[in-house]
């Protein structure tokens, strides 16, 4: 393991020192860092050698479970990536962006033992974003229950969404991308390009906004999304937030509210990858504006709202992973939910796939290229 310590000096400069212990690894993070304006921090390399890590979950015994998109779940224990892997993992549609995606433990895991997974499930017509829950005995899953699959399945290898969060009131929210077909996001007759809400057992809450409406899917909470690859529920304010991976420009941070339309592809701050326009408008009545957006795109993936006293300078801020621009992005939002400041952290760290907060309140980052897990240490 390598440790990097960053000291903030007079608001202008910082010094970097490096030390190695017996777990030193030449693949550990050693790139340049943009120091935060509000919080001094260090970085520990927790594990290297991962292949396309996507999600992270923390068990009460200290183990960290990390999903690899190809369909495996790795175990980090006592600062080491174990050779042993979790058994009885479901088969996945491991094409392009599809595969084994998010993993979260139930807030009451100590009593009920549930672990929730999202993955691209193979099936007729291609693959579809699927949610399941299971229990862990030793290093094997047992008592596996598939809860939901987004319909229709699509012969596409992009835009699965797939983040899962709990609201602490008996519900789960999770994201589903529009699978590369823009029009899906505006159609209430499918689950694609949506944020969805279920009871924890997979049934549909009776107070979902489109329950009882003909031709509308009852699981839908909000719509008009492109590819929400970050999702967080802030229990302190009882608000749901997502980050959406935009096209060429137009990544978004959104406050996600019941029944609302987030505009894709009718309004966007992005353009097609070939430079042609998607639309000529960025606002329309009845469609929500992002709280923050990025032009050019940073390729957002992974989202956490810092709720821990471990990082007093960042408390209440959002940390967002950047795939294309390979950093962690910090966004400050006012009490009125307006973006007031942002900055780049951990520059050139690698393609950031996940940013999560552990039960102890520490922040962890998973990257691909190289595949590793890092811990942000407050100073």
Pin down the residues of each PLM region.
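Short, conserved, GDST-rich strand-edge loop motifs in beta-rich repeat architectures
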Residues: 174-192, 250-252, 256
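C-terminal motif of bacterial Sec signal peptides marking the signal peptidase cleavage site
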Residues: 15-18
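Beta-propeller blade signature
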Residues: 129-139, 188-201, 256-257
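Conserved blade-ending motifs and adjacent loop-strand segments that build the rim/top face
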Residues: 225, 337-359
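Sec-dependent N-terminal signal peptides
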Residues: 4-12
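Surface-exposed loop and turn segments in beta-propeller and other repeat-based domains
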Residues: 85-98, 144-160, 200-222, 264-295
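Positively charged n-region of N-terminal signal peptides that target proteins for export
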Residues: 1-4, 378
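Acidic, Gly/Ser/Thr-rich repeat motifs that build Ca2+-stabilized beta-propeller blades
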Residues: 23-181, 233, 239-246, 296-334, ...
